[in-house]
Amino acid sequence: MKLNTLMKSYYSSYDYNQLRDETKSQYKYHIGIMLDTCLEDKPIGNLDCANVTSRMAKEAYDIWCDRGVSLANHVLSASRIAINYGLHMELCLVNPFLSVKRRGTTPRKTIWTREQVQTFLDTAYNDFHSRNIGLIAQMAYEWCQRLGDMRVLKWEDIDFDMKRVHIKQSKRRAEVFLPI
């Protein structure tokens, strides 16, 4: 079975279709990069699953790393997941991407000091047009939640009697109740 055919099977699977739309889109993008990567003058997608070796998977990973280590790690993860589906469905015998070691990435996080947070909030609250941004940022900071989750809060999410806010976290889909 060709890798292209295996991926079509994965895209029609229950496993894939139960993912969030954003995750499906990201997987399709990253798997597309994997399938289009040329090794030995052929796209990997045109190769038979049984003919893709660990060496080839490592060579493909090195090619992806030339575009960025973070991208390469995402492509590797999506490829592993999709080919593992093939293993479970007995469509292929091995997953050559499992033996590829990921390269580390430098964290993209910038940690603000309390003074920087205070300066940001002071600036936001001093201007009428940016006060809403300040409020969203302060709630995210105080409750350790994602900015996007704060942005979609509604008044009905606040229970003033119980003095708590109800938040549905977008990443984990968890529902949390935080004191206000």
Residue ranges with predicted function:
Residues 80, 151-152:
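Short, surface-exposed helix/turn micro-motifs that flank interaction/cofactor sites
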Residues 3, 20-23, 27, 71, ...:
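Hydrophobic (often cysteine-bearing) scaffold residues that line and stabilize catalytic clefts
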Residues 22, 106, 170-180:
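C-terminal catalytic core of Y-nucleophile DNA break-rejoin enzymes
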Residues 98-99, 162-168:
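Short functional hotspots where side chains directly engage DNA or cofactors
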Residues 8-22, 32-108, 122-124:
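N-terminal core-binding DNA-recognition domain of tyrosine recombinases/integrases
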Residues 152-158:
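A short, basic/aromatic helix-end/turn motif that makes direct DNA contacts
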Residues 31-32, 136:
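Generic structural marker for isolated residues within well-ordered, non-membrane alpha-helices
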Residues 69, 73-75, 88, 92, ...:
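Basic, Lys/Arg- and aromatic-enriched nucleic-acid-binding interface segment
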